[in-house]
Swiss-Prot record:
Keyword Cell membrane assigned: yes
Matching InterPro entries: Rce1/LyrA-like_dom
Record's GO cellular component terms: plasma membrane
Transmembrane found in the keyword field: yes
Source organism superkingdom: Bacteria
Membrane topology note: Multi-pass membrane protein
One of the GO biological process terms: CAAX-box protein maturation
Record-stated family: Belongs to the UPF0177 family.
Pfam families with a match to the protein in the record: Rce1-like
Protein name: UPF0177 protein YaiH
Membrane-spanning residues: 16-36, 51-71, 90-110, 131-151, 180-200, 210-230
Molecular-function GO terms, alphabetical: endopeptidase activity
Length: 236
């Protein structure tokens, strides 16, 4: 009995560790077209090159979303999703979304006032826009990223660690670190990660953190400009 319990324990760990890797492999699948355009699009130039890359990217993205959502659904990741639409939960998510935008605004303003955004990040963004049409990048950023990242960094990590406190810490730090690495911009991503983890931690409903993450990614550029306009705060 002891041997079976020990085996099941480690098999469960292996299952969710492998799932974490699998989710990211599926998530990054569409980016193959961005990484190797000279292989897939070498005979095309200009608009034809960008249009073809866009359709390939959209097709790959559709496959990734289908596989990712199917896997998460089969594993019960979307349990209680419809409960999001209860009034008290909607109000909570609205409040935390507003708080998240405000926190991000102040941390981002502070970061921009004291540090320089790495050139590589700017180059990568510009390069992506040259390969595919901008709306595709928006879909990837506002829809795909939240679905896969929340599934990996929230539910998968919480199932890997049975201790909720450890899961909370690992989820918050690893999500932020994955986006920044050893870079000062961690001061922007870590508070955001903590809030997103708190949203999931509250009821263990993945749909809630996905929804807030989607709103964050979709509206962030507009909200930043709006808050700068009404506060007059550009440096901190």
């Amino acid at each position: 009995m002891m041997d079976d319990s020990f085996k099941n324990y480690w098999m469960n760990k292996l299952k969710y560790f492998s799932l974490f890797i699998l989710l990211f492999a599926i998530y990054w699948f569409p980016d193959v077209i961005l990484g190797y355009p000279e292989i897939y699009l070498k005979s095309l130039v200009g608009y034809d090159r960008q249009a073809t890359a866009t359709w390939i990217f959209l097709g790959n993205m559709a496959i990734s979303l289908f596989l990712g959502i199917l896997i998460c659904y089969k594993l019960g990741y979307y349990k209680n999703t419809l409960s999001i639409f209860k009034i008290k939960n909607i109000l909570f998510l609205l409040f935390t979304t507003i708080v998240l935008f405000i926190i991000y605004f102040f941390t981002f303003t502070y970061y921009n006032s004291h540090f320089i955004t790495p050139g590589i990040a700017k180059e990568q963004a510009a390069y992506s826009r040259q390969i595919v049409f901008p709306f595709v990048q928006f879909i990837s950023f506002a829809i795909c990223a939240p679905i896969f990242e929340e599934a990996a960094f929230r539910t998968t990590i919480y199932r890997f660690f049975k201790n909720d406190k450890i899961a909370f810490i690992v989820s918050s730090i690893s999500f932020a670190w994955m986006h920044t690495g050893a870079n000062p911009i961690l001061i922007v991503y870590l508070p955001m990660s903590v809030v997103l983890t708190l949203i999931y931690h509250r009821r263990r409903v993945l749909g809630e953190s996905i929804l807030v993450h989607c709103l964050m990614n979709a509206l962030l550029p507009t909200i930043i400009v709006f808050l700068q306009t009404i506060t007059g705060l550009y440096y901190l």
